[in-house]
UniProtKB/Swiss-Prot annotation:
NCBIfam families: PRK09194.1, proS_fam_II
GO biological process, one term: prolyl-tRNA aminoacylation
Family: Belongs to the class-II aminoacyl-tRNA synthetase family. ProS type 1 subfamily.
EC number from the UniProt entry: 6.1.1.15
Annotated Pfam families: HGTP_anticodon, tRNA-synt_2b, tRNA_edit
SUPFAM superfamilies according to UniProt: Class II aaRS ABD-related, Class II aaRS and biotin synthetases, YbaK/ProRS associated domain
Name under which the protein is recorded: Proline--tRNA ligase
Superkingdom of source: Bacteria
Compartments in which it is found: Cytoplasm
UniProt free text on domains: Consists of three domains: the N-terminal catalytic domain, the editing domain and the C-terminal anticodon-binding domain.
Organism (species): Variovorax paradoxus (strain S110)
Subunit-structure text: Homodimer.
């Protein structure tokens, strides 16, 4: 491709609403253009990157035995009503009506449609396993679209769906997809981690997220430097502390803490470590009548160490809270504690509550908690002496750096990541809702076991940029670059020798199958170099009259600070060697 025929459009300044590097650089490099909130046009330069992502994903999906199809972007609501998602999903699901007042949705995923295909087409165990995938536009009406392609409303996604005869076979399909994902992200040349993720009601280790490592990532990735353990924050287990609980050493006292309503403020006032305080979180579960209407509520008190944060996914696995919970209302809090939030605790309750303590709190002695009286806290609190042992003990918190690794091979560290892929065993949720069955060897109908596997096609380039950029612009890995090599002739419009040499090298690289661009726009060297450094083409060759007289060209990788002189006759072989590195 020649630059004069292509569309190169760069900006000196990023739009004011671009908050992260990928958004700023993709806009400045002319890769995307904002059309509306969370909606972007993929400009020619950006589309080339997206097509390269799609090509690698498609190759590896086909290699893994998945079969490509394309499902409609606009789908009849009746399928979504079968599974209940039409009503259960919030405003993220875009619902529309046609001229006949029939309901439709704009797909965010396609479980319903692919399950409908399976129930019509898969009759026998002999047809299994099957794995269908598509690379298709999706729409999710995000409340706060931001960060460009990282969290847009319209996006391109690869979504795959496997169908198997039983859970063991589904696990095999899952593993094949997880292996394919590792090959995909290895080929992209990105630093990533595959981390265990929460698998919901299915249980087991049947869910993994693929996270590109980036300081600006929204997700916390927990890992052990001394082993292969990695999980997302929702999944990472906080082990029970080793050793017995210390003996009580302090008397129980009611201590004035005027105006100090947070654990941090109380610890500072009393001159004690934050880890000696205990925070009280009040939840509620609704009690329903036979018709399913709320007729009352059960109030719960969760106790966590003051320097720890509650993990809602873990809390949702506590017996009694696993059917759904909410934060208690102020009226419920006052009814049970007789006090406003900020001074709550497990002592001196007006009405009984169900008490759940985090594992860490169970081994604490002489701790500090609210006195259920404004401007007062209780100090020197001890289990057994001052209050009964809790009804339930569970892992309720997010892990922190330095916690023991669940695999026993060291301590945990935490880094940031951007989720670009997810593999997950669905089980029979959708097949039961939509009656998707097959006949086994005995001729008996069985529900299909399903898995789903997603990759954010348009999110991935943004994640790659967050990991690979500098003050000059993007630094693409070879596999993702819009062009792999750019030939930059200086004074091509004035020097026949430079023009001939540039055209010859361009044709030579094209013939060798290199994705090369010749910049024949006649730009000044500084402007030309700045454009390609911003756009992030990884390999640059500069041709000049002076260099030709010396029999040399200048090569520079995008990560290099200086150019390397290379004999003109061997430049193609030199570049090929760089590809192999």
């Amino acid at each position: 491709m020649k630059a004069s025929r292509f569309f190169v459009s760069t900006l000196k300044e990023a739009p004011a609403d671009a908050e992260v590097a990928s958004h700023r650089l993709m806009m400045r490099a002319g890769m995307i253009k904002k059309l509306g909130t969370g909606i972007y046009t993929y400009m020619p330069m950006g589309l080339r990157v997206i097509r390269k992502v799609e090509a690698i994903v498609r190759e590896e999906m086909n290699r893994a035995g998945a079969v490509e199809l394309t499902m409609p972007v606009v789908q009849p609501a009746e399928f979504w009503q079968e599974t209940g998602r039409f009503d259960k999903m919030g405003p993220e699901l875009l619902r529309i009506k046609d001229r006949h007042d029939r309901d439709f949705v704009v797909q965010p995923t396609s479980e319903e449609v692919v399950t409908d295909i399976a129930r019509q087409e898969i009759r026998s165990y002999k047809q299994l396993p099957k794995n269908f995938y598509q690379i298709q536009t999706k729409f999710r009406d995000e409340r706060r679209p931001r960060f460009g392609l990282m969290r847009g409303r319209e996006f391109i996604m690869k979504d795959a769906y496997s169908f198997d005869r039983d859970l063991d076979a589904a696990k095999a399909s899952y593993q094949a997809m997880a292996d394919a994902y590792r090959r995909i992200f290895d080929r992209f040349g990105l630093r990533y981690r595959a981390v265990a993720a929460d698998s919901g009601a299915i249980g087991g280790d049947l869910s993994e997220e693929f996270q590109v490592i980036a300081a600006t990532g929204e997700d916390a990735i927990v890992y052990c430097p001394g082993s292969d353990y990695a999980a997302n924050m929702e999944k990472a287990e906080a082990l029970a502390p080793a050793g017995p609980r210390p003996a009580a050493a302090k008397a129980l006292e009611k201590t004035p803490t005027p105006g100090k309503s947070t654990c941090a403020d109380v610890a500072e006032l009393l001159g004690v470590p934050l880890s000696t305080t205990v925070k009280s979180l009040v939840l509620a579960t609704d009690i329903l009548d036979e018709a399913g209407n709320p007729k009352g509520s059960q109030v719960w008190l969760l106790l966590l160490r003051g320097d720890h944060d509650m993990n809602e996914i873990k809390v949702g696995k506590v017996p009694g809270l696993d059917k759904g919970f909410r934060f208690a209302t102020l009226a419920e809090i006052d009814d049970h504690f007789g006090c406003k939030p900020g001074y709550l605790g497990p002592l001196n309750l007006k009405k009984p509550v169900r008490l759940v303590a985090d594992r860490e709190v169970m081994v604490m002695a002489d701790w500090i908690t609210g006195a259920n009286e404004v401007d007062f806290h209780m100090t020197g609190v001890n289990w057994g002496r001052d209050l009964p042992e809790p009804e339930l003990v569970a892992d309720l918190r997010n892990v922190v750096a330095g916690d023991a690794s669940p695999d026993g091979k060291g301590v945990l560290a935490i880094e940031r990541g951007i989720e670009v892929g997810h593999v997950f065993v669905l089980g029979t949720k959708y097949s039961k809702d939509m009656n998707a069955t097959y006949l086994d060897e005995a001729g008996k109908p069985q529900f299909l076991e399903m898995g789903c596997y997603g990759i954010g096609i348009t999110r991935l380039p943004a994640a790659a940029i967050e990991q690979n950029h500098d003050e000059r612009g993007i630094i693409w890995p070879d596999a993702l670059a819009p062009f792999t090599v750019v030939v930059c002739p200086i004074g091509m419009d004035r020097s026949p020798e430079v023009k001939v040499a540039a055209e010859a090298l361009y044709e030579q690289l094209l013939a060798a199958g290199v994705d090369v661009l010749l910049d024949d726009r006649g730009e000044r060297p500084g402007a030309m170099f700045a454009d390609w450094e911003l756009i992030g083409v990884p390999h640059r060759v500069v041709i000049s009259d002076r260099g030709l007289k010396e029999g040399q060209l200048e090569y520079q990788h995008r990560r290099d600070t200086a150019a390397t002189k290379v004999p003109a006759a061997g430049i193609a072989e030199f570049i090929a060697g760089k590809f192999a590195q």
